[in-house]
Amino acid sequence: MRGVGWQMLSLSLGLVLAILNKVAPQACPAQCSCSGSTVDCHGLALRSVPRNIPRNTERLDLNGNNITRITKTDFAGLRHLRVLQLMENKISTIERGAFQDLKELERLRLNRNHLQLFPELLFLGTAKLYRLDLSENQIQAIPRKAFRGAVDIKNLQLDYNQISCIEDGAFRALRDLEVLTLNNNNITRLSVASFNHMPKLRTFRLHSNNLYCDCHLAWLSDWLRQRPRVGLYTQCMGPSHLRGHNVAEVQKREFVCSGHQSFMAPSCSVLHCPAACTCSNNIVDCRGKGLTEIPTNLPETITEIRLEQNTIKVIPPGAFSPYKKLRRIDLSNNQISELAPDAFQGLRSLNSLVLYGNKITELPKSLFEGLFSLQLLLLNANKINCLRVDAFQDLHNLNLLSLYDNKLQTIAKGTFSPLRAIQTMHLAQNPFICDCHLKWLADYLHTNPIETSGARCTSPRRLANKRIGQIKSKKFRCSAKEQYFIPGTEDYRSKLSGDCFADLACPEKCRCEGTTVDCSNQKLNKIPEHIPQYTAELRLNNNEFTVLEATGIFKKLPQLRKINFSNNKITDIEEGAFEGASGVNEILLTSNRLENVQHKMFKGLESLKTLMLRSNRITCVGNDSFIGLSSVRLLSLYDNQITTVAPGAFDTLHSLSTLNLLANPFNCNCYLAWLGEWLRKKRIVTGNPRCQKPYFLKEIPIQDVAIQDFTCDDGNDDNSCSPLSRCPTECTCLDTVVRCSNKGLKVLPKGIPRDVTELYLDGNQFTLVPKELSNYKHLTLIDLSNNRISTLSNQSFSNMTQLLTLILSYNRLRCIPPRTFDGLKSLRLLSLHGNDISVVPEGAFNDLSALSHLAIGANPLYCDCNMQWLSDWVKSEYKEPGIARCAGPGEMADKLLLTTPSKKFTCQGPVDVNILAKCNPCLSNPCKNDGTCNSDPVDFYRCTCPYGFKGQDCDVPIHACISNPCKHGGTCHLKEGEEDGFWCICADGFEGENCEVNVDDCEDNDCENNSTCVDGINNYTCLCPPEYTGELCEEKLDFCAQDLNPCQHDSKCILTPKGFKCDCTPGYVGEHCDIDFDDCQDNKCKNGAHCTDAVNGYTCICPEGYSGLFCEFSPPMVLPRTSPCDNFDCQNGAQCIVRINEPICQCLPGYQGEKCEKLVSVNFINKESYLQIPSAKVRPQTNITLQIATDEDSGILLYKGDKDHIAVELYRGRVRASYDTGSHPASAIYSVETINDGNFHIVELLALDQSLSLSVDGGNPKIITNLSKQSTLNFDSPLYVGGMPGKSNVASLRQAPGQNGTSFHGCIRNLYINSELQDFQKVPMQTGILPGCEPCHKKVCAHGTCQPSSQAGFTCECQEGWMGPLCDQRTNDPCLGNKCVHGTCLPINAFSYSCKCLEGHGGVLCDEEEDLFNPCQAIKCKHGKCRLSGLGQPYCECSSGYTGDSCDREISCRGERIRDYYQKQQGYAACQTTKKVSRLECRGGCAGGQCCGPLRSKRRKYSFECTDGSSFVDEVEKVVKCGCTRCVS
């Protein structure tokens, strides 16, 4: 019975507890807000899903955080959850089963994350899910069972991913699908049954993919035509002839496959192995692939993964946990700075973990927990500054531990105790502090001599650089004299090092010394997040703080005692800003912009003793200003604007001993009467605060004023502490709504309440968005319409996280900076209507996730490809009502932003500089006279003028001589007393007021013999008649003298009174007998013969069968009979023809002989080709002659022998012959002539015993005589022509110094060996050798590569986009036959074009005349072009070498520094230097007939890289000095 009673009691207690649990409200997760069944945790920077989410939650908002991983326990038990928001996180991994408990889930948003893949059967338990958003991730493939179980999905969004593969049947379960978006992916093919089972599909997007329209995609065309309202703008991207065609418009016969292809379902290899990696034998190799994160699609059976030499920074939670069989992980040489504590959880088989060469500073707690099999752990070359005492507690089998080259100063005792199997340890290159806390390590290393790297002490000085294992343990001591690095904190930090409390890292931009953290003078506007916990003094003075926010930062600083906020711009302190700062006893807020003081500002400062509020803008001290500051002893309010102090203002300051109220404009009226008596009683005030009002009490100490004189008579009843002053005088206020419309305001009025929610500033004269607006965090509406705002900044609306409505319409906005609207995640309405905006940069609205209405009409939008994103953005949820229209370019004018197809937004040529200048006004070069242009938020742009000029555009000289009014080198002098007066002293040869007149020196000249005088500058020149010469034309010429005789072709020169005449030889005419008279003009050739001119005669070339001097004899009549060719056998494809009754063979290129039986010329087109001549052909005395043609610089021509050899090759365009008869080094000779010009050259080689003779084109021979020893040349070896085999026994040439060993590339013909013409058909021939010679000359193929051919001489392999025999015709050029009348054709794509009209013409075909005013018509630029400034003003942009308003002045000779690649042609390849070369270009003019040119240059060697993959080193001549020198014709 007793047992039954206890059972009943236990059952009753269980029921009671269950009921209490059901009734009691569940706790809300920390930082989140809960209302009913809704839990809101958005925008909290969470890195993981919070714990303890109430089980009854129906809606969970986790968007806008930093979550990286979803585990299968995160949402366990949430069986009532219907809506889950996970967008805008950093999720890269979702464990299988993560959503298995979410049986009621209806909507799931995972868009804007980092997902690359997701596991199959992920949604198996979510049968009620009807909306799933996976857009804007990095998903690469869709597995076959991706959506298995989620049969009720109606809306599935997969757009803007990287999907390239969809496994067959992936969508088979989604029979009720209504909306499917697959646009903007990398899809190339889809299986035929992909969408057939979706009868309810009403929205389907597939555009912006890489669809390949071959026979396997023909089904999609029919499918789309049957459903004309879905799949709009779906286009082919291949093959090339269908690129850009709508799939639905392509006919079935056009979907063709090349060859016999059979469709194979897309093989989604990326699902089983990362795209950048290789997978085999359970090993995944991702070394050096540029990865930035751990791949998620790894095979579950892997045993080893290699991730070294990438740029991975973070190891997320559970990164390797799914791969239970892992034995080795290599993460070395990355940039890892963050490791999740459970990154390696569950890897019980892991025996090697390599983490060296990263940026790890701390090992998280439990990082190596459960790694019982680990034997090798490499942590060297990191920045580890602390080891927890239990860091290695489970590593019982570890053999080798490397902590070499880190930042360890101490190690807690017991850290290495669990390492029972340790054999080797590396601790060197750490800054160890060898005090008493490290004594244990010395004892440990004495007992276990396993440290092999030589770990040494860094401090104290007496132990510096000594090996820890060799120091006696008694030397490790702590004393008051030995405090290192941070005085007073060493011992404290060392003791806690086992818990990694010694947070040594100093915040970025700050300086840490002792317990002081100095972050002053760094332009900070927020308190750094990671401040060391040992901080006692925090210096934040001289920064850019405007509001002190309640971030809870001081809760983490238990040692903090002093904070310095002086010299900032602080206007407000949020309630709770100092929460947790209970130990702080001194705060400096001197020189800020505080206007009032409230007790909530200082909440949490229970121990504060000193409060400095000097030099602020405080106007009132209320009786609640200092509540809670009972410990304050010193309070300074010096130099503020205090006029009133409320009675009892200092009563709560029980410990106050010093109060400074000096330098304040106190109004001694009735409201201040109490203060005089209080000052007399307390006697704690520094100095004597004085009255400033009323006038009769000015400068009277307050404590000396009689009580009856503190009156509010004569209207002096101002009270700065009155609550009525909470509304500016220019505005009207109702609750939290402030209206300041149409008040002519230029700055924000003072006194706007901090809790204002709606602020109306429309109809004023603001030119900028007031910076002070960022202080009003509760604003939900701002109206700044109808002002003069011309620019916005990236900080214009910072801190306005609650803003719902922003109206900026009817201003002068020209540019939207990319980050102007960052942080406005609650904004629902944005009005930019009626401005001058042309372009909105992509990403400008990224944070406007809640925006439902955008007004951007009445703006001159320039709708090219840079605005396509905005069109897509407004179309996505119809956020723009269809008012905004495009103003250009071209055909886009007047098109609606909302309805115009995205493909119409294209870029066609350069954008007008006036449009670009809206966001960068300096592009239009508005600053004249070398002024420097800078953007300015108020004046749009501002010019910094050089000396001598002023004005907005630096176009106004400060005095008359600045603009050099004296021409032609005249000297300008100012007239005293006249601002614009000047006079000129002219250079010789000029006169006039501005030296503009060149004196006519021909008025008194000495030119003789009727010569013509030509005026110069201070001189003149005589132009002589033909028969005279000399400076003054005083000498008569003898034209018939031998050195002057102009008569050509042996004609006779005869002197005449007027000069000379030529008596021509027969056949020549002309003044100088230089013209060969065309005797064919009156020829007697008959029967269609061709006349060929000759000197003093002509020749008739007769048609076939005709003969005679004038081809007058007809061919004899031939009776039908058998052709002579019938029995004449032409060889090698030659054609037999009959000529004069005789059969003749017309040989193909390369062949000759009576029957074309010999192959005598060949073309080497392969770098590995060669001919092999039998050894019997070559004897000790041999004469070899051949003809070659090439434009290459190098290549083997002839080679015979093994180690001792005769070799003839091309070397830098010359013929190089070497003869190695056994002496070393081998002798060599070079031809004087270069032969790589593409023409044929004769090379003759004569070998006689131990001498070798070389001759080119019949020139003087070069001879080698090598008599050092008897020749060992092997005459039994063959003779190789044009190359040689790459075997070791004939590789001496390839290895010889100065020789390249590459095969010949070009033509060889008429090879004679000992006067015997060689037939190449009879010798072994490699592939890549063609009969006939037609060498490829440079640039014969305009846009392609020349390849020799035996049939046509050569063929051109054209580049993409070009066609024709010489690659000089464009393919699919829509501009061929265009109809542009007064304009230029610009191709849009392969099928259409647009016309860019000339000035004064318009219309689609530029066939309409326009009468447009062009400001550039008013000025003429002599040596330059007219441009428009940012304000629309015309100016001249001068060509190089000229200056002046009209570009009419030539700049004197000077060298202009340029830095660019140096280019040259090398054979068939274009080559350029591997780096840019700095050199001078000489520009400008010179006087005295000289030219501007180089005076000094130098030669330097540079490396060149060529388009064919080759490289070489060559010299380049660089100009280093320019000046005036003799002109070179």
UniProtKB/Swiss-Prot annotation:
Q: Which residues are glycosylated?
A: N66, N186, N564, N623, N794, N799, N1009, N1010, N1019, N1183, N1266, N1300
Domain LRRNT as annotated: residue spans: 31-55, 264-300, 497-533, 718-754
- Written domain comment of the UniProt record: The leucine-rich repeat domain is sufficient for guiding both axon projection and neuronal migration, in vitro.
Q: Where is this site: Cleavage?
A: R1121, T1122
Q: Using the record's annotation, list all stretches that form the CTCK domain.
A: 1453-1528
For this entry, the protein name equals Slit homolog 2 protein
Instruction: Report the SS bond pairs.
Output: C277-C286, C434-C457, C436-C478, C506-C512, C510-C519, C668-C691, C670-C712, C727-C733, C731-C740, C863-C886, C865-C907, C922-C933, C927-C943, C945-C954, C961-C972, C966-C984, C986-C995, C1002-C1013, C1007-C1022, C1024-C1033, C1040-C1053, C1047-C1062, C1064-C1073, C1080-C1091, C1085-C1100, C1102-C1111, C1125-C1136, C1130-C1145, C1147-C1156, C1307-C1333, C1336-C1346, C1341-C1356, C1358-C1367, C1375-C1385, C1380-C1395, C1397-C1406, C1416-C1426, C1421-C1436, C1438-C1447, C1453-C1492, C1471-C1506, C1482-C1522, C1486-C1524
Which keywords does this Swiss-Prot/TrEMBL entry list? Chemotaxis, Developmental protein, Differentiation, Disulfide bond, EGF-like domain, Glycoprotein, Heparin-binding, Leucine-rich repeat, Neurogenesis, Repeat, Secreted, Signal
Instruction: Please tell me the species this chain comes from.
Output: Homo sapiens
Gene Ontology BP annotations: aortic valve morphogenesis; apoptotic process involved in luteolysis; axon extension involved in axon guidance; axon guidance; branching morphogenesis of an epithelial tube; cell migration involved in sprouting angiogenesis; cellular response to heparin; cellular response to hormone stimulus
Tissue-by-tissue expression: Fetal lung and kidney, and adult spinal cord. Weak expression in adult adrenal gland, thyroid, trachea and other tissues examined.
Any one cellular-component term (Gene Ontology) = extracellular space
Which regions does the record annotate with the repeat LRR? 56-77, 80-101, 104-125, 128-149, 152-173, 176-197, 301-322, 325-346, 349-370, 373-394, 397-418, 534-555, 559-580, 583-604, 607-628, 631-652, 755-777, 778-799, 802-823, 826-847
